A protein has these predicted regions:
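Basic, low-complexity intrinsically disordered segments
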Residues: 1-153
Length: 153
């Protein structure tokens, strides 16, 4: 969720809805797949707002003692960061929203400068018990300059 929020801010987008999904291996006995969605009161790219919205969704679909093969988040109904339609029941004033945006930009800047995860959200845990396997990661020649093939004549 944290990386999805960072990506939204980097692309100058806000999400008005989000979906959380999980599934076990389809090849293992007791296959399980589930998803849950929610609409946000206001479109947002604020990590704290998105984590708060995701928490009840995860609680609803998570099944303990089931090894997950895949889990993810979908940000939906994306809107430009420059356009924000507000309404009367806004939980934050415009000044508070600007302060939150400044905080998110500062956190992103620190994490870019000192490495991803330098500043973390407490709810995400300090030491994850697992890490994504990346030993067979495909090259991303279309999206990363470092992965472009070098041709020598």
């Amino acid at each position: 969720m944290v990386h999805a929020a960072e990506k939204l801010r980097r692309q100058r987008q806000r999400a008005a809805a989000l979906t959380i999904y999980t599934r076990t291996s389809p090849f293992a006995p007791g296959f399980y797949s589930q998803a849950a969605s929610t609409q946000l009161d206001l479109p947002s790219n604020d990590t704290a707002v998105l984590l708060e919205a995701a928490r009840p969704l995860v609680a609803r679909i998570f099944r303990p003692h089931r090894p997950l093969a895949k889990a993810g988040v979908l940000m939906q109904h994306l809107q430009s960061h420059d356009i924000l339609q507000t309404h009367l029941m806004v939980p934050m004033s415009e000044e508070q929203q600007q302060k939150r945006e400044c905080l998110m930009q500062t956190i992103d800047r620190i994490n870019r400068r000192y490495g991803r995860g330098t500043l973390q959200w407490a709810g995400c845990g300090l030491q994850p018990s697992w890490l994504m396997r990346r030993e067979q990661l495909s090259r991303a020649a279309t999206t990363r300059l470092q992965d472009l093939p070098v041709v020598k004549a």
